[in-house]
């Protein structure tokens, strides 16, 4: 099993409600990648300290999963050189203003996307691939044909932007769990 912590990237000053994430909350974080990266790294350290204080989990076996904006954040966590075994991004934004430096990425990186996701078009997937190559990272990008954004959310039903996909959801999670098992066992 896993010990799971959730991160609030918005803070106490306000947060979105409902399924839509207003740009008034998301926009400033997207425009300030240094701030976003600092927050996600601070969250990792706070979670690690909390787990140690409570005596739960194994701090040497850390990974990060993220969905949509969270998927972007876990990619930035990897780009920053954070000491995590793996990061898994589900339908996250792949672009960054702070690409990984050569040799910086320690985590095994998995980005799972719909090939028809307007938030992560092919050009962005190609750019992430090139960035990971230059960084010398261990990476996998999986794009499901005919699949849109939010494919892991059974309530998503707004094609052509977002729509649930049972097969992409199932296969993506299977690959993510296999990556975690291998990363924690030192097989990759």
Feature map (PLM): residue ranges:
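Short alpha-helix in the alpha/beta-hydrolase fold that links the catalytic acid
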Residues: 121-132
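Serine-hydrolase catalytic machinery in alpha/beta-hydrolase-like enzymes
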Residues: 1-57, 152-158
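Alpha/beta-hydrolase fold nucleophile elbow
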Residues: 53-67
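Short beta-strand/loop motif that positions the catalytic acidic residue
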Residues: 105, 111-113, 117, 144
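Gly/Ala-rich beta-loop-alpha elbow adjacent to hydrolase catalytic centers
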Residues: 66-70, 74
